[in-house]
Swiss-Prot record:
Disulfide bonds join C27-C42, C34-C47, C41-C64, C49-C62. It is found in: Secreted. This is Latartoxin-1a. Residues 20-25 form a propeptide. Keywords: Disulfide bond, Knottin, Neurotoxin, Secreted, Signal, Toxin. A motif (Processing quadruplet motif) lies at residues 22-25. Expressed by the venom gland. One of its GO terms (molecular function) is toxin activity. The C-terminal part (65-85) forms an alpha-helix which probably disrupts target membranes. The presence of a 'disulfide through disulfide knot' structurally defines this protein as a knottin. Insect toxin. Causes paralysis in larvae of C.vicina by depolarizing membranes at the neuromuscular junction. Pfam families: Toxin_35.
Length: 85
């Protein structure tokens, strides 16, 4: 009986871990809203937020943007490609 309960608990925990892992893989692409999920932007991107005033009420709007490090890597790669040609 204890073995059966242990097996069921392990099965449930495994399903929870796998479903959490699948959710983590679905990242938010560039220029999409990340207001409610700020830590799930795709690698090389970060959630940047701006305070806007629409119709007299202040609202925070966030979007996934390329990080400064990702921009520098992209620019460096282009410069190296130019000099190799």
């Amino acid at each position: 009986m204890k073995v059966l309960v242990f097996a069921i608990v392990c099965s449930v925990l495994l399903q929870v871990v796998l479903s959490a892992d699948e959710e983590a893989r679905e990242c938010i692409p560039t220029k999409h809203d990340c207001t409610n999920d700020r830590k799930n932007c795709c690698p090389g991107h970060e959630c940047k937020c701006y305070n806007t005033q629409i119709g007299g009420s202040k609202k925070e709007q966030c979007g996934c943007k390329k990080s400064l490090l990702a921009k520098a890597k992209n620019f460096g790669g282009k410069v190296i490609t130019i000099f190799k040609a």
